[in-house]
Amino acid sequence: MTLAALAAMLWSLPAAAQEEYRQPALENPESWSVVVIPDLQGYAKNEASQPIARLMTAWIADNIERLNVRVVLCVGDVVEQNDRIGNGFSGDLTSVRQWQGMADAFDVLDGRVPYLVATGNHDYTYTRSGARRTHLNEYF
């Protein structure tokens, strides 16, 4: 590829760039919203990815009024392991730090919008099967 061809290609990139961000809005002013948060365990288990969960809940908090958010539902699998024992599991955080990090992410919603956090299979015991106990009620 010649330098001129490369320059032409790079010059055209801004034209194909993403459009400017537009704030979400309801089409009907009578409408309201339910926000559903999917499995969070992928964000909970690593120090580097926990801020992504905080960005998600901060976005919700910033849009409560604009989208008339009535409730937030988290479908479960909040953490990777309820009780992390030994090595061999993915992630670099203990289960306590996983639970605390996700609870901290939801703090921004406290007193602003009701939210429900369900348990998933990752939120019980230290394997995906076994005793049916969870630390969810200690953090939420």
Language-model segments: what does each one mean?
Residues 7-9, 30, 57, 97, ...:
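Short, low-complexity intrinsically disordered segments
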Residues 1, 43-45, 127:
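Short amphipathic alpha-helical "recognition" segments used for binding
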Residues 2, 18-20, 99-100:
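Short secondary-structure boundary micro-motifs
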Residues 84-140:
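Extended active-site neighborhood of metal-dependent phosphoesterases/phosphodiesterases
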Residues 11, 28, 65, 109-111:
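Short, structurally constrained coil/turn elements
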Residues 17-93:
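N-terminal active-site segment of His-dependent metallophosphoesterases
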Residues 2-12:
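Bacterial N-terminal signal peptides
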